[in-house]
Amino acid sequence: MNAYEVNFDGLVGPTHNYSGLSFGNVASTSNVSAASNPKLAAKQGLQKMKALYDLGFKQGVLAPQERPDVASLRRLGFGGSDAEVIARAAKEAPTILAAATSASCMWTANAATVSPSADTADGRVHFTPANLNNKFHRSIEHPTTRRVLRAMFADETRFAVHEALPAQMHFGDEGAANHTRFCADYGQPGVEFFVFGAAAFDMRYPKPAKFPARQTLEASQAVARLHGLSEAGVVYAQQDPDTIDAGVFHNDVISVGNGEVLFHHQQAFLNQADVLDEIARKLEARGGRFTAIEVPRAEVTVEEAVKSYLFNSQLLSKPGGKMLIVVPEECRNSERVWSYLQKLAASGGPIDEVRVFDLKQSMQNGGGPACLRLRVALNQAELAAVNPKVLMSDALFASLNGWVDRHYRDRLAPEDLADPQLLIECRGALDELTGILGLGSVYPFQLA
């Protein structure tokens, strides 16, 4: 049975703004207080989805969340009507209001970790929504994420959508941004690669000194257990703490994998040679031949990688076996990074094509092409069981573009977050969207 990788991109929400909430994410904190353009952000994301769909890749959409999250504000002691809750939070705790209004769920690489049926003990596709415990504004996402995923992957004979891990620092989980999978074919058993920043209980592992390590070893191990993965099909690796301190807050900022290929920086992992050898051995046992493409720091420094988001790219398998790499415009703006990419495409290796997308609205918050998508490997029967309304088509693209035009502002400044009308606009937009995507009632305001 044929199998495919489907990329489910996050649809940017109506409250997309620059509040600088993500300590350790250099782009996020560098653009704090700038005015954003939610309409442009959503359209940039949609254009990437449509372009890849037009190239023949399987593409889906993951809905944004209700923001501001009034329920979270109420839990923090802000009372009254919805408008009064927002007004009081704006006056007494504007940073908390900004966190409750964040559109960060657009980066669906953090939505969940996904294991395909070929890897799991029960033969189902498994999803574990990430608790995103390290940042308050992201930690409130997972209940809605789970409801949305269950509306998309509703057939419980084929799909298992777990609850998030305990929302506690020892099990800090950032989802697929620290996970990739190697395989000879998407429908064959593969090797799942879990990257962590620190261990919560084992003091032998080093930790970064400046920025937090958001993913723990214990969280990665728990997800592997939940998904029923075998030891023969799992590799754990620790990200180099120095790269975390250089702004590599998720592993998808310093490496990207697909199929039998890992594209990574020289300083991506601790004990890098041993890590690569373990992947190669385990993949060979599952019928694959591993290729590691290592970018030397002499050609691209960690700092250049962070600024350009070279590794926060998408590797996509083309017919014939070669791969396309999707990078943000910032890579073309860096002379050394662009020079490296041109050399890479001409090298005769597995990556032979580079595609550039303008994702500036997302990039200014620290999210490139890889951040915006959740990869789900599905066989034909599983793909047929997915809610068809969330799969990209010419009609869905036109419908979503019109939806954005009707509901999104083209400018959102920090002071606008105090406007109670923003909540009304967001709820109206999402109520219509659940109809377009066939999700049913998934948002708190719909469930009240």
UniProtKB/Swiss-Prot annotation:
The keyword Hydrolase applies. GO terms for biological process: arginine catabolic process to glutamate; arginine catabolic process to succinate. It catalyses: N(2)-succinyl-L-arginine + 2 H2O + 2 H(+) = N(2)-succinyl-L-ornithine + 2 NH4(+) + CO2. Belongs to the succinylarginine dihydrolase family. GO terms for molecular function: N-succinylarginine dihydrolase activity. InterPro entries: AstB_sf, SuccinylArg_d-Hdrlase_AstB. The gene is astB. This is N-succinylarginine dihydrolase. PANTHER family: N-SUCCINYLARGININE DIHYDROLASE. The active site is at residues 174, 250, 371. Its EC number is 3.5.3.23.
